[in-house]
A protein has these predicted regions:
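Non-cysteine beta-strand/loop elements that form the S-adenosyl-L-methionine
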Residues: 125-141
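A short helix-to-beta-strand connector/capping loop
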Residues: 101-103, 122, 127, 203
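Short intrinsically disordered, low-complexity coil segments enriched in acidic
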Residues: 1-4, 131, 203
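Divalent metal-binding segments
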Residues: 1-112, 137-188
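C-terminal active-site-proximal or functional interface alpha/beta core segments in diverse enzymes
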Residues: 69, 201-203
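Carboxylate/His-rich catalytic cores and anion/metal-binding grooves
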Residues: 12, 113-126
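Distinct, well-ordered alpha-helical segments
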Residues: 89-95, 117-119, 189-201
Length: 203
């Protein structure tokens, strides 16, 4: 699996496609002829692909990345975790390893499952993946109020109804947590701002 530069699509060879579930391959965002994965097919495909990464590779990747960042003077990392590893393995790994790494880490859990955030004791929630309100311009699925200039039938994709985003923002705000959401297109930005307004208005 090779990720697109924008982090919102990927292409798989036939061997990787064979490992993916029917849920991914039957998704409208999956093109089994070309191997391209977009939107929910991409997110679910990445979630399934992470199951094939050995735990020691995760540990080496985290520690090696932290050492490199330290070598170029970076001492604080805002890390977004929760990309589909079984039992949130990446979340547990960063929690265990962070005290021994050369940076301070501020962890954002990429989930709308507020119970899971509370269970891990985090005060920050959000990022991309489960918090992606839309896609991106590179894949032409950033959510817009007006159609794409090169495709008058394409307004992009909103991944959630407004009510669901409001519910998430209100719940997280009640806990006093810091919230981040991925919103690229103007329709998604408006959805995000509307959810923040709902959270602030909540009594």
């Amino acid at each position: 699996m090779v990720m697109k530069y924008d982090g919102h699509a990927a292409v798989c060879n036939s061997a990787m496609l064979a490992l993916l579930s029917d849920k991914v391959k039957s998704d409208p965002g999956c093109n089994t002829e070309t191997g391209w994965l977009y939107q929910s097919a991409f997110y679910n495909g990445v979630n399934e692909a992470t199951a094939y990464i050995p735990t020691m590779d995760i540990i080496r990747g985290l520690s090696g990345g932290a050492e490199y960042l330290a070598s170029v003077g970076i001492g604080l990392v805002h890390t977004v975790e929760g990309v589909g590893f079984a039992n949130d393995l990446d979340i547990d790994m960063i929690k265990i390893l962070a005290p021994g790494l050369p940076q301070a880490f501020r962890i954002f859990f990429q989930t709308m499952d507020l119970k899971a955030v509370k269970k891990h004791g985090f005060k920050r929630v959000g990022g991309c993946f489960k918090l992606a309100l839309d896609g991106c311009f590179g894949s032409e699925d950033a959510a817009l109020k007006e159609p794409y200039a090169n495709d008058p039938n394409n307004y992009g994709v909103l991944n959630y109804p407004q009510e669901r985003v409001n519910e998430f923002a209100i719940g997280a705000n009640r806990e006093g947590w810091q919230i981040t959401m991925h919103a690229i297109g103007d329709a998604a930005v408006e959805q995000c701002i509307t959810a923040y307004e709902a959270a602030y208005a909540d009594k």
